[in-house]
């Protein structure tokens, strides 16, 4: 007579083999998900590289920041146009070039796209505040952010910004980086680039900007929308005087 199968009792527990099988399944799923994430990340980096390489000979039509601002304005303030016109580097006043360097990144011509001391100071300030309030950005870092990234402040986005900064410094010379920056940076509500700023504020081409006009425009860069609405701000005039005095020492990037 055959023995009847014995049913698991109330204290029955799955075998070690079954537990190992489940763990292997979870590990495979995690490996797959990690591979998909890594592949997507790599594809994104290759896209950035391809775009930047193309911009060594082709002028960018717009930036991610500009497109986001255009969308926002079209919904919130549809009467406000986007003003932007690309002009060659030699059609931008040397006064504006010197003023922007004096105001935003005094060592731009010689640094590698990063200022380690500024990054460390920003890190300490952010740590003290418990959130990101400062980025310690050079001109190249600002360009990386404006060309590709959102306005969100996070350490992940900051890391991506540093990677794109390295790409820009590797694939483009300093003069080209500065040319793209001057043609894409925000100078006011819907105002992008040196030519649009010169026409909007002074009704002249960017090539004719004076030292004082250039200093005022450069001072607006950290908060352009605010200063667009507060052009008579005492701070704007005071800070412009400081920048005007520093412009003579500002070193422009060498032509390649």
Swiss-Prot record:
Class of this enzyme: transferase
Localization: Cell inner membrane
GO CC terms: peptidoglycan-based cell wall; plasma membrane
Role played: Peptidoglycan polymerase that catalyzes glycan chain elongation from lipid-linked precursors.
A Pfam entry, by short name: Transgly
Protein's name according to its UniProt entry: Biosynthetic peptidoglycan transglycosylase
Catalysed reactions listed for this entry: [GlcNAc-(1->4)-Mur2Ac(oyl-L-Ala-gamma-D-Glu-L-Lys-D-Ala-D-Ala)](n)-di-trans,octa-cis-undecaprenyl diphosphate + beta-D-GlcNAc-(1->4)-Mur2Ac(oyl-L-Ala-gamma-D-Glu-L-Lys-D-Ala-D-Ala)-di-trans,octa-cis-undecaprenyl diphosphate = [GlcNAc-(1->4)-Mur2Ac(oyl-L-Ala-gamma-D-Glu-L-Lys-D-Ala-D-Ala)](n+1)-di-trans,octa-cis-undecaprenyl diphosphate + di-trans,octa-cis-undecaprenyl diphosphate + H(+)
Enzyme Commission (EC) number: 2.4.99.28
Pathway of action: Cell wall biogenesis; peptidoglycan biosynthesis
Keywords: Cell inner membrane, Cell membrane, Cell shape, Cell wall biogenesis/degradation, Glycosyltransferase, Membrane, Peptidoglycan synthesis, Transferase, Transmembrane, Transmembrane helix
GO-annotated biological processes: cell wall organization; peptidoglycan biosynthetic process; regulation of cell shape
Keyword DNA-binding in record: no
NCBIfam families registered for this protein in UniProt: mono_pep_trsgly
Family as reported in the entry's similarity comment: Belongs to the glycosyltransferase 51 family.
Cytoplasm listed as a keyword: no
Membrane topology classification: Single-pass membrane protein
GO molecular function: pentosyltransferase activity; peptidoglycan glycosyltransferase activity
